[in-house]
Design a protein with these regions (language model features):
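Active-site helix/loop of acyl-thioester processing domains in fatty-acid/polyketide metabolism
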Residues: 25, 55-78
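Short, low-complexity, intrinsically disordered N-terminal peptides in bacterial proteins
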Residues: 1-2, 141
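Conserved positions in beta-strands of structured domains
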Residues: 23-26, 87, 92, 104-108
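Hydrophobic beta-strand-centered segment that forms part of the acyl-chain substrate-binding groove
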Residues: 2, 67-102, 114, 130-136
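Flexible, low-complexity linker/boundary loops enriched in proline and small hydrophobic residues
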Residues: 3-24
């Protein structure tokens, strides 16, 4: 199992700071296991909520989506992954500064260049977010 760091991840994903939201990822068979440490100075915490910062749910979903795209890293050359759907998302506990999210993502099916993924995010072993994600690989122009 090779661990990809942020520099490695940038060779596959088009995301860059401040929108690159995974710190490392490891492939374990058909599952991507990624991490993101919430530092507390992220742009999305400004105003969400003053004095009680919580990672917005949509950002948690984006973290899961980026983690999922690593599953098809060999097919990303010449393509951009676009998040195209989300189903059955549940938020179970808040994610706060100082927390490290662990994301587990697995492709459940594929239709051409469209991928369906089950993803779950945990903090300290407890589920904070889960859902079914869909993304498509589109040709770069």
């Amino acid at each position: 199992m090779n661990v990809l760091n942020r520099d490695d991840i940038k060779t596959f994903l088009p995301h860059r700071e401040p929108m690159l939201l995974i710190d490392d990822v490891t492939m374990d068979g058909d599952t991507a296991i990624a991490h993101y440490h919430v530092r507390g100075d992220e742009f999305f915490l400004q105003g969400h909520f003053p004095g009680n910062p919580v990672v917005p749910g949509v950002i948690q979903c984006e973290i899961m989506a980026q983690s999922s795209c690593i599953l098809v890293r060999d097919e990303l050359v010449g393509h951009t992954p676009l998040y195209s759907g989300i189903n059955n998302v549940r938020f179970r506990q808040p994610v706060r500064p100082g927390d490290t999210m662990e994301i587990r993502a697995r492709i459940t099916s594929r239709r051409g260049m469209i991928f369906f993924v089950d993803a779950k995010a945990l903090v300290n072993g407890k589920a904070c977010c889960s859902g079914e994600l869909t993304f498509a690989l589109i040709d770069n122009k």
